[in-house]
Amino acid sequence: MGIIKDRQGFTLIELLLVIVIIAMAVAVAAPNIGSGNQTASLNAAAREIASALRFARGHALTHRKETVFLLNLEGNTYQLTDRKKVYKITKDIAVTLDAAQSQIIDKNQGGIRFFSDGSSTGGRITLELGENKRQLDVNWLTGQVEIDGW
């Protein structure tokens, strides 16, 4: 019996080395997967609120009457005047509002008013989730909405 020189397959050492490399890659990638979900959730909330603000501005322009975006910080909800539906923001997201004093109802409620010419009272809505933060700025002169922090 001779020694077989052309054996096909992998040695135990080679297989263990591949398993160690895969384990290291998973250990590095796993923490980033969770933060990606947080970022996606925060971005989605920012886009939804920005869309509602833009809708409020458009509604004020087309119907030639004031429209108010109302934000409830305690309940993490918002709604528009002339609409009964209350929209929810994920409870994990911390929301703050910096608005004109005339639009502050109490410490937990306030809003941004859009006028029939497209202008507004202006303001900033800040969304925070973990270390991630998004700011929605409403220009008082033009009523335009921008999202900062992408």
How should each PLM-predicted stretch be described?
Residues 2-4, 16, 24, 28-54, ...:
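N-terminal helix-rich module
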